[in-house]
């Protein structure tokens, strides 16, 4: 279903408002003069910023290092969300703490682009997720490319946006995504098939596993959300699976505490390392994963190293 609903404006009204605005401010180029695109997560925010440059004000609601399943926004941000020219969201059940605000904006007629509508959505690989759709599509660069291809025409059609600039920037960024995909394929090809086994603290790598032929052995937190909690039997079953699969490294999400992962590694009757990955959130500029491309390259290197033959 296409959830993008364009906002129609009368040309005469828009022209009149432009003249009045120029007389009142006496200048151009401020944030108020540019279209406003509100983006739910910082990963999508980075993608949008790469496509639009300075033509558009991009308001990313999710802070660096936050959990996309549970982050919340201020009253001021909620008000700006309802006045945006476009909202870009994941839309596959990821932004649990934000959904009420997205729904409110939709009811007020704010146009929206839902990335999940452009993705070949996969169900969670785990039975404890109850067959729910997996929102973590960005772990497969090919899925991110599909989102870019669907989003670009929407951005090009916005009032106040230079379509030529968006087309040029999107072509360049798409090339970078294709290069990333090739790099990941080469890096993971060096891992023997028997060792392509992933254990994480949260079910986040379903798309990566499907694209690059990994097995998802399990996750510390059951189900598809970080808001769940594992039982003692859940952890015992996962320890057994780790031992049976001969898993060498458990990967912990940087935005989540790793104490359960560390405890799990100690319980397993094999030599298991714990490695931090950036999977659900970008970081501050100095944090190691300030943008999507860097995040994916860091994760690729750490996965390839962690699962390499010893």
Task: Outline where the language-model segments fall.
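Hydrophobic core
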Residues: 18-23
């Amino acid at each position: 279903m296409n959830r993008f609903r364009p906002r129609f404006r009368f040309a005469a009204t828009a022209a009149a408002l432009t003249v009045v605005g120029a007389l009142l401010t006496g200048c151009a180029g401020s944030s108020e003069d540019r279209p406003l695109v509100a983006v739910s997560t910082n990963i999508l925010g980075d993608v949008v910023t790469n496509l639009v440059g300075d033509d558009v004000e991009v308001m990313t609601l999710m802070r660096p290092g936050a959990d996309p399943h549970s982050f919340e926004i201020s009253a001021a941000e909620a008000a700006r969300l309802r006045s945006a020219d476009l909202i870009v969201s994941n839309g596959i059940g990821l932004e649990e703490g934000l959904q009420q605000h997205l729904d409110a904006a939709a009811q007020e007629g704010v146009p929206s682009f839902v990335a999940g509508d452009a993705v070949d959505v996969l169900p969670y690989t785990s039975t404890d997720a109850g067959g729910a759709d997996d929102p973590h599509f960005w772990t497969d660069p090919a899925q991110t490319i599909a989102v870019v291809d669907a989003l670009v025409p929407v951005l090009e059609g916005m009032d106040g946006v230079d379509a030529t600039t968006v087309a040029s920037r999107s072509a360049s960024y798409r090339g970078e995504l294709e290069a990333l995909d090739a790099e990941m394929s080469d890096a993971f090809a060096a891992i023997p098939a028997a060792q392509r086994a992933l254990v994480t603290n949260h079910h986040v790598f379903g798309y990566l596993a499907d694209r690059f032929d990994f097995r998802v052995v399990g996750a510390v937190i059951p189900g598809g959300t970080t808001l769940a909690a594992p039982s003692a039997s859940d952890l015992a079953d996962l320890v057994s699976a780790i031992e049976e699969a001969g898993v060498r490294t458990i990967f912990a999400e940087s935005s989540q505490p790793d104490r359960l992962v560390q405890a799990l590694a100690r319980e397993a009757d094999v030599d298991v390392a714990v490695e931090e990955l950036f999977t659900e959130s970008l970081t501050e500029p100095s944090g190691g994963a300030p943008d999507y491309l860097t995040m994916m390259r860091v994760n690729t290197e750490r996965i390839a190293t962690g699962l390499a033959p010893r």
